[in-house]
Amino acid sequence: MKTLLLTLVMVTIMCLDLGYTLTCYKGYHDTVVCKPHETICYEYFIPATHGNAILARGCGTSCPGGIRPVCCRTDLCNK
């Protein structure tokens, strides 16, 4: 009986952990819930004309290039 109870507890913990999804900033103030396979929040600048740069934020599977890339793996860490 104890073995069955322990097995049920372990299965429950595993199922809860597998259901976790990351939340990242997208743009300046908006947030987005990442897809299950996207495990990284990123932030970087895209060069634009006249010396300006555009901020890019979101979810990804790997750290992208760009100017001053920042990548992290916790909720809302890309601000």
UniProtKB/Swiss-Prot annotation:
SUPFAM superfamilies: Snake toxin-like. InterPro entries: Snake_3FTx, Snake_toxin-like_sf, Toxin_cobra-type. Keywords: Acetylcholine receptor inhibiting toxin, Disulfide bond, Ion channel impairing toxin, Neurotoxin, Postsynaptic neurotoxin, Secreted, Signal, Toxin. GO terms for cellular component: extracellular region. It is found in: Secreted. Expressed by the venom gland. Disulfide bonds join 24-41, 34-59, 63-71, 72-77. This is Short neurotoxin 1/5.
